[in-house]
């Protein structure tokens, strides 16, 4: 058995920077199966358990060991650069473990250089796969941020069977996302640490399919929305503990305002229509927060966007165009179809959030596949906007220049490394996009 497993281990190794072959995938699956069987046989022998029970125990033990190994590896900042038409862009993915003011990370339950991978589905203390994602351009001798947001896994610890613990866990994860959002706004964070009660606007864009027909993403979306609702009652002040520059825990006061969306982006949503109605019941309310009660494309934006535009900011035209595009998509239900651009609504919501000085946050179930594609779509469009000073029209395919930007972003956005951090292998398993 051990000789066979050694051969499988050798076959399972991917020996170059390329996708695994079918033979390597089969060897990896066979190795996992044999390891679980070996643990089961040992458990049966030692503890006298029935075969079925021993196998169940072995499968859980194997998964727990996998999670522990992935969580305990170093989680470090990923930084990549790309050049297009003479401009130099930097993509940065900063993990929760490196969100620091002093020597330690800012979270009350410290990460200590480690992380929480997407497979840690019972964790009720930390958000899964929590990163701050930034794209900047080097101009006039300094770096200018084009976009910054927070990405993570679903707020639901969905394998926790106790409903009370699951809800507590979802709220703890939401608090970590809010803490990361505050960290992404240094001026606001400094005010909070100085004792001021600060208002924090967050646009949360879930990318799940809000249905339980295949998988349980419908329940996960409910858990996530419930967590946001519990933390953002009108006028509610919440207290977060943040580790300051001296390494001491300090209580800060924030008034969170969250516009919580969910936009299905995979085939189950966009080809089969699963979860669209449930998602849009959340989206209608969030759009009113963001754009006011009159969602006709020709109407002047209200809500958060209206407040921003009333200041006549430098980015007036970009904000107005994004708002109009979002209302057009909504009116025509374009977000219910792929149309060659599955992320059309989700991407524009995140971009609009950033432009009006709110914090964009987005997530799928794991925080790596759909979340990673969304990350790349946002960065592609921001680099394109910086190059051409024009926003793409919804449903339009990138021209050859846009395609080149996208290829560079896909390879240099940090998403391949995040995939490897969570699974041990780089790549992306998004259902056709």
Curated annotation (Swiss-Prot):
Locus of motif CX5R motif: 364-370
Family affiliation: Belongs to the phosphatase IpgD/SopB family.
Keyword Ribosomal protein: no
The EC number(s) this enzyme carries: 3.1.3.-
Gene source species: Salmonella blockley
Any Gene Ontology CC annotation: extracellular region
InterPro entries in alphabetical order: IpgD/SopB (IPR008108)
Role noted for this protein: Converts phosphatidylinositol 3,4,5-trisphosphate (PtdIns 3,4,5-P3) to PtdIns 3-P and prevents the transition of PtdIns 3-P to PtdIns 3,5-P2. It is one of the known effectors injected by Salmonella into the host cell and is required for invasion and for an efficient generation and maintenance of Salmonella-containing vacuole (SVC). Alteration of the phosphoinositide composition of the plasma membrane causes membrane ruffling and actin cytoskeleton rearrangements.
The UniProt record lists the keyword Secreted: yes
The protein, known as: Inositol phosphate phosphatase SopB
Subcellular location: Secreted
Principal place of residence: secreted
UniProt feature coiled coil, ranges: none
């Amino acid at each position: 058995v051990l000789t066979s497993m050694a051969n499988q281990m050798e076959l399972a190794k991917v020996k170059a920077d390329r996708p695994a072959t079918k033979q390597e995938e089969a060897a990896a699956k066979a190795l996992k199966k044999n390891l679980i069987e070996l643990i089961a046989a040992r458990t049966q022998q030692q503890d006298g358990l029935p075969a079925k029970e021993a196998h169940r125990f072995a499968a859980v033990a194997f998964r727990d060991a996998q999670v522990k190994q992935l969580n305990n590896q170093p989680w470090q900042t990923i930084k990549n650069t790309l050049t297009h038409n003479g401009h130099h862009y930097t993509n940065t993915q900063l993990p929760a473990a490196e969100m620091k003011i002093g020597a330690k990370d800012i979270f009350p339950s410290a990460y200590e250089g480690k992380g929480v991978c997407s497979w840690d589905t019972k964790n009720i203390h930390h958000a899964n796969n929590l990163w701050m994602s930034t794209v900047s351009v080097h101009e006039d001798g300094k770096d200018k941020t084009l976009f910054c947001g927070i990405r993570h896994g679903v707020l639901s610890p969905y394998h926790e069977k106790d409903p009370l613990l699951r809800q507590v866990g979802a709220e703890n994860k939401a608090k970590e996302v809010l803490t990361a959002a505050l960290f992404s706004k240094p001026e606001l964070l400094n005010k909070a640490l100085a004792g001021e009660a600060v208002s924090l606007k967050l646009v949360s864009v879930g990318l799940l399919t809000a249905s339980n027909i295949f998988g349980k993403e419908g329940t996960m979306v409910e858990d996530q929305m419930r967590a946001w609702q519990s933390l953002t009652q009108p006028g509610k002040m919440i207290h977060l503990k943040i580790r300051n520059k001296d390494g001491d825990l300090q209580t800060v006061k924030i008034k969170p305002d969250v516009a919580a969306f969910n936009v299905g982006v995979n085939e189950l949503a966009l080809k089969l229509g699963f979860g669209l109605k449930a998602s849009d019941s959340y989206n209608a309310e969030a759009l009113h927060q963001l754009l006011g009660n009159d969602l006709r494309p020709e109407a002047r934006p209200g809500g958060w966007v209206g407040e921003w535009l009333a200041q006549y900011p430098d980015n007036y035209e970009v904000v107005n165009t994004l708002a109009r595009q979002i209302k057009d998509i909504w009116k025509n239900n374009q977000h219910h179809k792929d149309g060659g651009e599955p992320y059309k609504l989700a991407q524009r919501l995140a971009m609009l959030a950033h432009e009006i000085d709110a914090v964009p946050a987005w997530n799928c179930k794991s925080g790596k596949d759909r979340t990673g594609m969304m990350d790349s779509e946002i960065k592609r469009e921001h680099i394109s906007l910086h190059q051409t000073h024009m926003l793409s029209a919804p449903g339009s395919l990138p021209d050859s220049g846009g395609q080149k930007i996208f290829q560079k972003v896909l390879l240099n956005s940090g998403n391949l490394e995040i995939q490897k951090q969570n699974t041990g292998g780089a790549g992306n398993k998004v259902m056709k996009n």
